UniProtKB/Swiss-Prot annotation:
Disulfide bonds join C155-C243. This is Spore coat polysaccharide biosynthesis protein SpsA. The active site is at D191. Glycosyltransferase implicated in the synthesis of the spore coat. InterPro entries: Glyco_trans_2-like, Glycosyltransf_2, Nucleotide-diphossugar_trans. Keywords: Disulfide bond, Glycosyltransferase, Transferase. Pfam families: Glycos_transf_2.
């Protein structure tokens, strides 16, 4: 069985997905399986993905979902991640998106950290984000640090910077009935909602190195949500829950 299960979600990012997949398959640590969970992307994106399927570490799954209404009935990336978790065989679980780049030693360094520190169930690294305009020019650069142990991770950490033991998921599902929350009320902050669940049991331990790079583009769901574009997708979403709500509820529980 592989040591690590990497779960990548994908949807219509033909300009970026090849770089994302390549950054994972070229890791210095090779004992992993990669789930590419595609949400029925266009043919252009699928043509980019297909050459990578010859690698025996890759497991590709494509949904048959269609239509805006169906896409807003659940937080789609959470549903895809839950599907992958049910199939995952790794001792450790980590995440990626189709516009996220792993640094070459990301898996090696995070596996080493968990192997060396059995008391740590969840770790996270620092990460860099490039914000791109419609011409794909970098207009802003930000860094999320990894400086402290936290019992209040929602909206402070990106899920592409996290690795955790599979056993974390078992505790989460036992308490909440699922791994990631698929409610569309958390479309904006699906990873924050998952971290909220995890923080009921475990703190997040820092690994103070930049081990992944993210792109925020006009193709991303988060761009659409944060810019509040009045498109059909946004109009069909229910009112969105927020970071403050999650963080305050953890504080009331004595977490952070």
């Amino acid at each position: 069985m592989p040591k690590v299960s990497v779960i990548m979600t994908s949807y219509n990012k033909s300009d970026y997905v090849a770089k994302s997949i390549s950054s994972i398959l070229s890791q210095t640590f090779s004992d992993f399986e990669l789930f590419i969970m595609d949400d029925n992307s266009n043919e252009e994106t699928l043509n980019v993905i297909r050459p990578f399927l010859n690698d025996n570490r890759v497991r590709f799954y494509q949904s048959d979902i269609s239509g805006v209404k169906e896409r807003t009935e659940k937080t789609r990336y959470a549903a895809l991640i839950n599907q992958a978790i049910e199939m995952a065989e790794g001792e450790y679980i980590t995440y990626a998106t189709d516009d996220n780049i792993y640094m070459p030693d990301r898996l090696l360094k995070m596996v080493r950290e968990l192997d060396t520190h059995p008391e740590k169930a969840v770790i996270y690294s620092a990460s860099k984000t490039y914000h791109l305009n419609e011409n794909r020019d970098i207009v802003k650069e930000t860094v999320r640090p990894a400086a402290q142990v936290t019992w209040n991770a929602p909206c402070a950490i990106d899920h592409c910077s996290v690795m955790h033991r599979y056993s974390v998921l078992e505790k989460v599902k036992e308490k909440f009935g699922s791994y990631w929350d698929e409610s569309p009320a958390f479309y904006r902050i699906g990873d924050a909602r998952f971290f909220w669940r995890v923080n009921h049991f475990y703190p997040f331990y820092p690994l103070d190195e930049e081990l992944d790079l993210n792109y925020i583009t006009d193709q991303s769901i988060h761009f659409q949500l944060f810019e509040l574009e009045k498109n059909e997708f946004v109009r069909n979403l229910p009112p969105q829950r927020n970071c403050r709500e999650l963080r305050e509820s953890l504080k009331k529980l004595g977490m952070g």
